[in-house]
Amino acid sequence: MNLLELVEKAGVTGCGGAGFPTHIKWNAKADWFIVNAVECEPLLQTDQYLMRNRADDIVYACRQAAEMIGAQNAVIAVKRAYGKEIAALEKAVETAGAAVRIHRMDSFYPAGDEQVIVYEVTGKTVPCGGIPLDVGVVVSNVATLAAAFDAMKEEPFIMKYITVAGAVNSPAVIRAPLGTSVSECVEAAGGAAADDCFVVSGGPMMGKKIACDAVSGRVTKTTSGILVLPKGGFMEEYKGDMDLEALKKRARSACIQCSYCTMLCPRHLLGHPLEPHRIMRAAAFSEDLDQLLESDGPVRNASLCSLCGVCTAYACPMGLEPSKLNAFLKEEMARRGIRRSGKETTVPLPDREWRKVPTGRISRRVGTADYGGTKEDALIEIRPEEVAIALRQGPGVLPQPVVAAGDRVSPGTLIASIPAGALGSNLHASIEGTVVEVSDVIRIRG
């Protein structure tokens, strides 16, 4: 089998974002193949662990993927502050004699946004509403490359490297089977260090608040971090829900139109016509949602928002939440099938370099700077007695279960499959045991 067939069979997906199936993303021709090893979110250290401990695998997979898509340029983008990680990668490149370049980036947020990386590495800007492939670039997360290397050895994607951090007693990088409960992951890191906490899956800026006792409280293919955070602080409000009327009332009463949200918006700095202050103004004085969305102007440009949260967590002096409004509008536009017109090219703003937000400053602003880091090369392996693997692991079609209650499975047994070439990913058993439930999850008990 070729590389595409191997990653499809193994069920490899993107590990750093929405979980887009890798066999679909890599089925392309491009001039550039970029490995996103920036890991720009505060607290997350998973990719750093992988670079230190699996550099040879990452470089090998990078070279193979670049050759497959015909890329003349294979690049690993990493923060220049990651000295040990860069040294490990450079040694792996030298040992392999690989034509892979290490690109050093400054520590700013969100340096790991794929459109930011494309510009920083290639000098090209992705068109509004476009994807990196529009400018001849394919970007994949470093953890995806590690999973692709495993797939080359015909090992399915059934284990996740995850940072467990925040208000825990022993922050750690863990390796957990898909479907492991979040509560078990937290216990592996010494348990919560405070009584009244909530959990975020992902990074503090773009991660999602989850319930530990629900299906959402399980390790999936896209789980990069599990953060335990105390209630009562900024992060609880930042991750809380708010309806449109509440957002409109706050915008009407408190927005001073200072435009800081727009001036610091990473997508606006790349030249995109995304202007959060104009969206806030429109929302404040619109009669209803229909009126707000009727014109193809500033409001529909909310679809360009990456939801990085710079506007809400850092820029706004009034404590307003433009990113939540953008998220609401994006979801509503998708539900109604509304798309902004145009896919225009962009030119970065001349003062972009001076408006980048340092990662350390945003970490202090949101209250995560004082939490301890993980032990550098320690890895905790979790072996749960039961897993519940959700059929929905990312975009596309749901895989169809090929097992039934009562079936015995081993790690790597195919339990749900997608049609050949479909947008979606195969699922495999992550532990040995008996299938006890097949619904929107496949539950396996050891």
State each model region's role.
Residues G11-N27, A313, L423:
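Conserved phosphate/anionic-ligand binding catalytic regions in large, soluble enzymes, centered on
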Residues G16, L43-L44, G123, D290-L292, ...:
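Flanking helices and flexible, charged tails adjoining ferredoxin-like Fe-S electron-transfer domains
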Residues V35-D47, V168:
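Gly-rich Lys/Arg/Thr-decorated short loops/hinges at beta-loop-alpha junctions or inter-strand turns
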Residues R52-I69:
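Histidine-anchored nucleotide/phosphate-binding helix
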Residues V75, R80-E184, A188-D195, V200-P204, ...:
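Hydrophobic alpha-helical positions that pack around
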Residues A176, T220, V403-V409:
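Short, well-ordered loop/turn sites that connect or cap secondary structure elements
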Residues D195-P204, A214, T222-L229, E287, ...:
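Beta-strand/loop-dominated core regions that host nucleotide or nucleotide-derived cofactor-binding catalytic loops
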Residues L229-R252, T262, R267-P348:
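Ferredoxin-type iron-sulfur electron-transfer modules in oxidoreductases and energy-metabolism complexes
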